[in-house]
UniProtKB/Swiss-Prot annotation:
InterPro entries: Rib_uL2_dom2 (IPR014722), Ribosomal_uL24_euk/arc (IPR005756), Ribosomal_uL24_KOW (IPR041988), Translation_prot_SH3-like_sf (IPR008991). Residues 9-18 have a biased composition (Basic residues). Residues 1-33 are annotated as: Disordered. One of its GO terms (biological process) is ribosomal large subunit biogenesis. NCBIfam families: rplX_A_E. This is Large ribosomal subunit protein uL24.
Length: 146
């Protein structure tokens, strides 16, 4: 949904910034959702994906495959997962590119910068949850369902 009338949502105008995005902008665009365990633990929904994270593919041909991230290829906007390869016609094996949106992060590689990012995102989310008044309680919803 569009909130700011001064920001365009036109496909035509958004294509150029998308394809000419810098590496730092692509890092944010190449985010993946966290698994339900990590989401409850850190109170964060998604994170920019990085090299030594572990992930599981949730959509596409390779659905269900898990592994450690071998490479985050920002220029092509794909990620390579270890042991996810295919054989070319000439016999060489190549890594298969997967879009980061089709992957769920199951294990994070944490360093001090990433921990601070998690804390910052969780703090913002907690503030938003506090402001949001729940109109109905879980009991009210369940009574209406039955």
């Amino acid at each position: 949904m569009k909130y700011n009338p001064r920001v365009t949502s036109s496909r035509r105008r958004n294509r150029k910034p998308h394809f000419t995005a810098s590496s730092s902008e692509r890092r944010v665009x190449m985010s993946s959702p966290l698994s339900t365990d990590l989401r409850q633990k850190y109170n964060v929904r998604s994170m920019p994906i990085r090299k030594d994270d572990e992930x599981q593919i949730v959509r596409g041909t390779y659905k269900g495959r898990e592994g450690k991230l071998x490479q985050v290829y920002r220029r092509k906007x794909v990620i390579h997962i270890e042991r996810l390869t295919r054989e070319k016609v000439n016999g060489t094996t190549v890594n298969v590119g997967v879009q980061p949106t089709k992957v769920v992060i199951t294990k994070l590689r944490l360093d001090k910068d990433r921990k601070s990012l998690l804390e910052r995102k969780a703090k913002g989310r907690a503030a938003a949850d506090k402001d949001k008044g729940t109109k109905f309680t879980a009991v009210d919803v369940m009574q209406n369902v039955x």
